[in-house]
Amino acid sequence: MKQVRLPSSATVRAACAVAVAALAGCAQIPRDPIIQQPMTAQPPMPMSMQAPGSIYNPGFAGRPLFEDQRPRNIGDILTIMIAENINATKSSGANTNRQGNTDFNVPTAGFLGGLFAKANLSATGANKFAATGGASAANTFNGTITVTVTNVLPNGNLVVSGEKQMLINQGNEFVRFSGVVNPNTISGANSVYSTQVADAKIEYSSKGYINEAETMGWLQRFFLNIAPW
C-alpha cells in the first residue's frame, strides 16, 4: 500500500495566507461618505408652562408673535437650492533651446609627408526641450433638498444636514447635503442657495445594478493588483 504524504501545517498556513492576500486584493474598497454628521436632529421637548390666561401664549422656544418663520432652532427645516457650476482650466508649457559652435585651427609640426601639417578642430552642440500640458474639469449639479438644523453656533449660524433617498427601477439614489448657513441669507420662502452655504458638502451616490455595472469586476481587480505594468 502506497503511503500518501500530506503537506505540513506550515505549508498549509502559508498557502492560506497567500490565498487570503490574493482575495483581499480582489476585494472592493468601500467608499466612505464625505458627510459624517447626523442627517437629522430632534428638537428638545418644550418645558410645560402654566397658561397665564392671556390672549397670546408663546409657542415652542418662545417664538415671538410678530417674527417670521425662518429656522433658528434645532429641528427646524430649511430648503437648499443646489446650483453648483464649477469650471476649471489649467495649461502650462516650457520651451528651451541651446546651441553652441566652436571652430579653431591648431598648428602642428609636419610629419608623415605633411599629412598633419595643419589641423582644424570644430565642435557643435545643440540641446532642445519642449513640453506642454493642460487639464480641464467641469461639474454641474442642480436640484433642491430640504435639510434639518442640527446645531446652532454661538454666533447664530445654523449647522444643517439632510439626505434624500429615491428608489428608481431597482436603483437607490442618495443625495446628502451639509453645511453652515447664515440666517441673514435665508429668503422669505425659507430657502437659500448652496453657493451661500459655508463648508458645503454635497454627495450624490447610488446603489443598484447601474452602480454595479460601473464597478470593476473582482477578476479584473485581481489582475490589476498583480500586474507589473
From Swiss-Prot:
Chain residues carrying a lipid of type N-palmitoyl cysteine: 26
Keywords of the record: Bacterial flagellum, Cell outer membrane, Lipoprotein, Membrane, Palmitate, Signal
GO CC terms of this entry: bacterial-type flagellum basal body, distal rod, L ring; cell outer membrane
Keyword Oxidoreductase carried by entry: no
UniProt record, GO biological process: bacterial-type flagellum-dependent cell motility
GO molecular function: cytoskeletal motor activity
Coiled-coil zones: none
Localization per Swiss-Prot or TrEMBL: Cell outer membrane; Bacterial flagellum basal body
Stored Pfam families: FlgH (PF02107)
Lipid attachment locations (S-diacylglycerol cysteine): 26
InterPro entries: Flag_Lring
Membrane topology: Lipid-anchor
Signal peptide location: 1-25
KW rRNA processing (keyword) present: no
Job of this protein: Assembles around the rod to form the L-ring and probably protects the motor/basal body from shearing forces during rotation.
Family that this chain belongs to: Belongs to the FlgH family.
PANTHER family xref list: FLAGELLAR L-RING PROTEIN
Assembly notes: The basal body constitutes a major portion of the flagellar organelle and consists of four rings (L,P,S, and M) mounted on a central rod.
Name by which UniProt lists this protein: Flagellar L-ring protein
